[in-house]
Amino acid sequence: MEQKTTLIVRGGGDLASGVIHRLYKCGYQVLVLECERPSAIRRKVSFGEAVYDGTSYVEEVTGRLITNIKECPKVWAAGEIPILIDEAGESVKSLKPAAVIDAILAKKNLGTTRDMASLTIALGPGFTAQKDVDYVVETQRGHNLGRVIEKGTA
């Protein structure tokens, strides 16, 4: 059986869910780390809703709430995305993912550091590329939306 690359996405809101969905469709094993009481503007397209409902669905992809990181292989084997309540990101240490993507969109860094994985990416303001994370992605509407920032801030 082929070993898939594991990635962690911090945050399961609507924008994060777009990233999660795309990574899943590209064949990555994605673990979503969510807070205890997530909020999202577009709740029907947010994997974070699994925290409340046990499951969430975004374009026919299922997110499933788990209570322990040891449940990940079973959920991945079912073709689903595990959602774990782990606001502090403690499970990053034990899972050792290839990349950590911070998609919390808190407009400030809530603890993501470059030493969490070989590749770290953050969405939106509050991060400095090459200091806090490797890359920052611009999330503000306009001509620079989606731009990858290699040095500096969004």
In which residue ranges do the predicted regions lie?
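Well-ordered secondary-structure scaffolds
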Residues: 2-154
